[in-house]
Swiss-Prot record:
UniProt-annotated stretches for the region Disordered: 1-21
UniProt-recorded name of the protein: Large ribosomal subunit protein bL32
Lineage: Bacteria, Bacillati, Mycoplasmatota, Mycoplasmoidales, Metamycoplasmataceae
Organism encoding this protein: Mycoplasmopsis agalactiae (strain NCTC 10123 / CIP 59.7 / PG2)
InterPro entries: Ribosomal_bL32, Ribosomal_bL32_bact, Ribosomal_zn-bd
A GO CC annotation given for this chain: large ribosomal subunit
Keyword annotations from UniProtKB, A to Z: Ribonucleoprotein, Ribosomal protein
Amino acid sequence: MAIVPKRKTSKQRKHKRRTNDALPVQNLISCKNCSNMIQQHRVCEHCGFYKGKKVEGYKSLNLRAQ
């Protein structure tokens, strides 16, 4: 025979257990150079700029398409 729970799991206990299952909200900002939405502290994928400066050795999506 299988083991059965001694008591019914309450809704509150069930919901408390599920509090950490939500996906985190990404912090999006607009790029100062091209105004596209990007994640904070990342190089812009469209123009290759970070903090107003062009990043060396980074190929943006615009250059990859050509």
